[in-house]
Amino acid sequence: MKNLIYQYWDGDTSRPGVIAGVKAMKKYAEKIGAEYLFEDNPRYYTHLGPYSPHYGQFKLIHEEKFSDYDHIMFADTDVFPVEKLEKSIFDDLTADIGICAEGWMTKNKGKTPAESYNPICRDADEVWAAKLEQRFGVKFPRCEETNHLMMYNSGMVVYNNKGLKEAKQKFMQYEDYIRTISPCASFYTCDQPYLHAQLIIKDINWQ
């Protein structure tokens, strides 16, 4: 198996948090026999507004040099492996793309901007999802306990080779996605809601 852990940072890479995160993830890659790649200021996207740096994680979908890996994990530099972890993250992937649910946020996010202390709230989530459901004829997953929309975190995403290829073929153009959800709050134009949406509307095999 040819596996890769990929990280990047657009900005000041001398920040202690970046240095620590990269060091820890590189060590973990060595433990599980995976290749490791950190890119210093690749600035892959620069035309998507303030969230351009966030979309850099999708470089691994589009660039040919990543296409021959069996598995790739993207992780933000503030993601740390559990201390002394020996098990490979790739062993637990049973679908084509793996992503983590935002369990606490799904259940506890405020309903309104006043309750959330910012524009990212359950009411705004509903507007965002409704725009995509109306256009694509899909239903977004909901928490069985609260019926709130499920939220997913794009800070760590695992792909197998099929998942990489399907993402390249099926994912919306970023500009089209941003137009579709307009005029949602700016957060909904970033990589996390974008990836969440693609997994649902493009019928990807994900977990």
Regions found by a protein language model. Give the residues of each.
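Catalytic core and acceptor-binding pocket of nucleotide-sugar-dependent glycosyltransferases
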Residues: 135-207
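N-terminal anchoring/stem segment of glycosyltransferases
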Residues: 1-70, 162
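Short, solvent-exposed loop/turn segments at secondary-structure junctions
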Residues: 10-12, 43-44, 79-80, 104-106, ...
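Short acidic (Asp/Glu) patches
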Residues: 58, 123-143
